[in-house]
């Protein structure tokens, strides 16, 4: 399991955790020097586990789908909670021996924001926010769980996908911050960027369809080819366009 302990967390240990998370995901080669995730995998390798420990030493284990870096479920050790619409094999393979429950929402942002009654841009990130999220999930407070899961997903999966998000969180070891429109636009466009970067391989580096992002100054930017910084320095994992 990949592990991250908040009680001794530093900017450096968080970056190491994200590096270890990226490395734990099986790859299908690289495109423009960016690792591509698998499009299919045998059940026994479908999920990886990450252990997260809060300031008080309470821990949860989250299960991540290696095909898309989605969190599908988490466990407190005795009880496990699965999102709706997870891969059918997830409950058979994960957290056996726990009391398995299904959360009242799927893991997508729209559903979680509706359940949280808040948009992501109004939910604070940073390692203190992750500590609170782990506490909420450990004790399972139904009302607060959706917000906590939004923090968890962005601090793990999204940081693994994008170096920019990783660095924003690494720079907030002792503080909380609300995600910028830059972060939100990256999260919303990971699939689109992944697809266009893979298409560009056969189009001399050109995207078939531009991807619109928001830069740190708040401007809309059209990404049209693989020379963009988002491709050369930011995105760290690509969703395989062969994955269904």
From Swiss-Prot:
<dbReference type="InterPro" id="IPR016139">
    <property type="entry name" value="Ribosome_inactivat_prot_sub2"/>
</dbReference>
<protein>
    <recommendedName>
        <fullName>Ribosome-inactivating protein cucurmosin</fullName>
        <ecNumber>3.2.2.22</ecNumber>
    </recommendedName>
</protein>
<feature type="glycosylation site" description="N-linked (GlcNAc...) asparagine">
    <location>
        <position position="189"/>
    </location>
</feature>
<dbReference type="InterPro" id="IPR017989">
    <property type="entry name" value="Ribosome_inactivat_1/2"/>
</dbReference>
<dbReference type="InterPro" id="IPR001574">
    <property type="entry name" value="Ribosome_inactivat_prot"/>
</dbReference>
<feature type="active site">
    <location>
        <position position="161"/>
    </location>
</feature>
<dbReference type="InterPro" id="IPR016138">
    <property type="entry name" value="Ribosome_inactivat_prot_sub1"/>
</dbReference>
<keyword id="KW-0652">Protein synthesis inhibitor</keyword>
<dbReference type="InterPro" id="IPR017988">
    <property type="entry name" value="Ribosome_inactivat_prot_CS"/>
</dbReference>
<feature type="active site">
    <location>
        <position position="158"/>
    </location>
</feature>
<keyword id="KW-0378">Hydrolase</keyword>
<feature type="active site">
    <location>
        <position position="109"/>
    </location>
</feature>
<keyword id="KW-0611">Plant defense</keyword>
<dbReference type="GO" id="GO:0006952">
    <property type="term" value="P:defense response"/>
</dbReference>
<dbReference type="GO" id="GO:0017148">
    <property type="term" value="P:negative regulation of translation"/>
</dbReference>
<comment type="similarity">
    <text>Belongs to the ribosome-inactivating protein family. Type 1 RIP subfamily.</text>
</comment>
<dbReference type="Pfam" id="PF00161">
    <property type="entry name" value="RIP"/>
</dbReference>
<comment type="function">
    <text>Has cytotoxic activity towards cancer cells, but not normal cells. Inhibits the growth of the human leukemia cell line K562, the murine melanoma cell line B16 and the lung adenocarcinoma cell line A549 with IC(50) values of 88.1 nM, 63.4 nM and 359.3 nM respectively.</text>
</comment>
<keyword id="KW-0325">Glycoprotein</keyword>
<feature type="active site">
    <location>
        <position position="70"/>
    </location>
</feature>
<dbReference type="GO" id="GO:0030598">
    <property type="term" value="F:rRNA N-glycosylase activity"/>
</dbReference>
<dbReference type="InterPro" id="IPR036041">
    <property type="entry name" value="Ribosome-inact_prot_sf"/>
</dbReference>
<dbReference type="GO" id="GO:0090729">
    <property type="term" value="F:toxin activity"/>
</dbReference>
<keyword id="KW-0800">Toxin</keyword>
<feature type="glycosylation site" description="N-linked (GlcNAc...) asparagine">
    <location>
        <position position="225"/>
    </location>
</feature>
């Amino acid at each position: 399991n990949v592990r991250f302990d908040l009680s001794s967390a530093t900017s450096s240990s968080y970056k190491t955790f994200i590096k270890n998370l990226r490395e734990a995901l099986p790859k299908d080669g690289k495109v423009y020097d960016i690792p591509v995730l698998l499009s299919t995998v045998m059940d026994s390798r479908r999920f990886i586990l990450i252990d997260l420990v809060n300031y008080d030493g309470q821990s949860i284990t989250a299960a991540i789908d290696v095909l898309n870096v989605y969190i599908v479920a988490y466990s407190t050790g005795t009880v496990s909670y699965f999102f709706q619409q997870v891969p059918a094999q997830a409950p058979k393979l994960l957290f056996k021996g726990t009391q398995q429950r299904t959360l009242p929402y799927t893991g997508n942002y729209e559903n979680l924001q509706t359940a949280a009654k808040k948009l992501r841009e109004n939910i604070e990130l940073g390692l203190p926010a992750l500590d609170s999220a782990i506490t909420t999930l450990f004790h399972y407070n139904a009302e607060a769980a959706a917000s906590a899961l939004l923090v968890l997903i962005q601090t793990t999966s999204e940081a693994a996908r994008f170096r920019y998000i990783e660095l924003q969180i690494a720079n907030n070891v002792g503080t909380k911050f609300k995600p910028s429109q830059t972060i939100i636009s990256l999260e919303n466009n990971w699939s689109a960027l992944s697809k266009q970067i893979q298409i560009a391989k056969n189009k001399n580096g050109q995207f078939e369809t531009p991807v619109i992002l928001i830069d740190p100054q708040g401007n809309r930017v059209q990404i049209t080819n693989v020379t963009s910084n988002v491709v050369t320095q930011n995105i760290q994992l690509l969703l395989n366009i062969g994955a269904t």
